[in-house]
From Swiss-Prot:
Family recorded in the similarity comment: Belongs to the ferredoxin--NADP reductase type 2 family.
Transmembrane segment boundaries: none
InterPro entries documented for this protein: FAD/NAD-bd_sf, FAD/NAD-binding_dom, Fd--NADP_Rdtase_type_2, Ferredoxin-NADP_redctase_2
Record-level Gene Ontology MF annotations: ferredoxin-NADP+ reductase activity; flavin adenine dinucleotide binding; NADP binding
Keyword set includes Zinc: no
Key word NADP present: yes
Protein name per Swiss-Prot or TrEMBL: Ferredoxin--NADP reductase
Reaction equation(s) it catalyzes: 2 reduced [2Fe-2S]-[ferredoxin] + NADP(+) + H(+) = 2 oxidized [2Fe-2S]-[ferredoxin] + NADPH
SUPFAM superfamilies: FAD/NAD(P)-binding domain (SSF51905)
Binding-site list for FAD: D38, Q46, Y51, V91, F129, D295, T336
EC number: 1.18.1.2
Amino acid sequence: MSQSTPLRTDVVVIGAGPVGLSAVFQCGMLKLRCHVVDALEAPGGQLTALYPEKPIYDVPGFPSIPAGELIDRLLEQVAPFTPEFHLSQQVIALEAVAGAEPAAWRLTTSRGVVLEAAAVIIAAGAGAFGPNRPPLDRLEAFEGTSVFYMVSKREAFRGRKVVIAGGGDSAVDWAISLSDVAERVHVVHRRPKFRCAPESAARLDQLAAEGKIDLVIPYQLKALGGTEGRLESVTVADLDGAERQLDADVLLPFFGLAANLGPIAEWGLGVERQTIPVTQATCRTARPGIYAVGDVASYPGKLKLILTGFAEASAAAHNAFHDCRPGEALHFEHSTTTGVPGIPA
């Protein structure tokens, strides 16, 4: 059930990845208030959900920075502007507010939150992410207590018996990382070889040889054991059907994330190949007051880089200012002159 009174703000940013957070910062510098909606349970987009400890090399000023640390720094940067986050939900409906002055959009989320804003900045990347869930009976009973699809803090798994399922970078990287804190780490993969960086595969083999990781290959998940949402065991089966039971109190299935633009594709934005065409200079879409930035935005010569997305976020924010403050002049000034609004110089 939706709330009776819409939450009014200047800008709604759809997507809390690095480019979405950059858009929040740029809006804040222009004294525009933001609400942020994201389908994931924590800000950061792919950087948090898939590879928080992977280094990123192409952010200016950082020869190398872990993806999760970049998100932490972006969150620190937007904190003075107190954006309001609406996580674990999607925007499922968008409509123009009849008779609004200035013109406004009404957005409704999958949790019934209703927002009204003069501008919308879509920073949805490839779309709303959701995990590819293994087809196991009673899986839902353990989700959120013993089964998790992302790791935000590895300390939460200290002393735990962890089963990681999957054969890609996320599965291997977290197996390596959690081997330092977990009581036991089992890695279940249906193939004898892993699809990951060669250095990660070598490190995984080394830890397995040292007895710090148990490689359960080639096996697949078969069943979960436990009561009242508390996992006690994971049953796996090999290609011949022979079963093995693993003691476990945590299961981390890393089978990738499925991304889809979902309702965004129905908003009259001319979506092509899961991207939204925009005017490069402004990042405006085909509908006034709606902008797209980052990987979801497309124009001739587009480079899908974080750096490009940061520049697009700035362009979108400066143009959204005129939607939010019609008739008010925007005098461009460098941050070295203005400082950060609300923070003493």
